[in-house]
């Protein structure tokens, strides 16, 4: 059974999982739901949200299932931070890794995550705002920090869908 399994915090990862499931015609379950519906050892594509470089739920999913690809959803632009995310999560080189830019709304975060992001918004936002030679990626990050932003799109999944279609 091939399935998309995800862990989401504010909804971006769930939104990507649903878009990908529709595009690839695969069932989609949260990691919690999957424990009761998807047999251990099944082949999956795992999507998780990124916090400080860590993909939430990946280690648990990797213990339960045969992870065939990983998508990390965070604030960075799609396709960036691949080495850092792979290293931090100990994702084997044989497993394709994709990073996807999600939405950002600090009000949707809860508890310690909200506190941490409020601190990050103040410190990183101030640092980026004062920087005179920002890159396009830094301009985009600053815009998200200041104004929030919706970045989930089917276009961001293009590399994932191309990979999947190339192996099937």
Predicted regions and their residues:
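Charged/polar, solvent-exposed surface patches and flexible loops
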Residues: 22, 60, 83-87, 114, ...
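Helix-loop-strand module that forms the ligand-binding subsite of alpha/beta enzymes
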Residues: 32-112
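Glycine-rich phosphate/pyrophosphate-binding loop and the adjoining helix
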Residues: 119-168
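Short, solvent-exposed beta-strand-terminating loops
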Residues: 102-128
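Loop/helix-junction capping segments adjacent to catalytic residues or to phosphate/diphosphate-binding pockets
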Residues: 11-14, 79, 106, 154
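N-terminal beta1-alpha1-beta2 submodule of the flavodoxin-like/Rossmannoid cofactor-binding fold
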Residues: 1-64, 162-168
């Amino acid at each position: 059974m091939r399935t998309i399994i995800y862990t989401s915090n504010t909804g971006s990862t769930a939104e990507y999982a649903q878009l990908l499931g529709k595009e690839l015609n695969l069932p989609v379950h949260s990691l919690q739901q999957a424990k009761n519906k998807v047999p251990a050892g099944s082949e999956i594509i795992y999507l998780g949200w990124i916090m400080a470089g860590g993909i939430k739920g990946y280690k648990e999913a990797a213990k339960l299932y045969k992870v065939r690809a990983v998508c990390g959803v965070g604030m960075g632009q799609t396709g960036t931070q691949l080495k850092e995310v792979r290293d931090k999560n100990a994702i084997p080189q044989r497993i394709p890794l994709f990073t996807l830019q999600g939405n950002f709304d600090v009000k949707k975060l809860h508890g310690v995550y909200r506190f941490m992001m409020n601190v990050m918004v103040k410190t990183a936002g101030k640092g980026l705002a004062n920087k005179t030679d920002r890159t396009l990626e830094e301009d985009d990050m600053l815009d998200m920090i200041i104004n929030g932003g919706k970045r989930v799109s089917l276009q961001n999944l293009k590399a994932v869908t191309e990979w999947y279609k190339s192996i099937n």
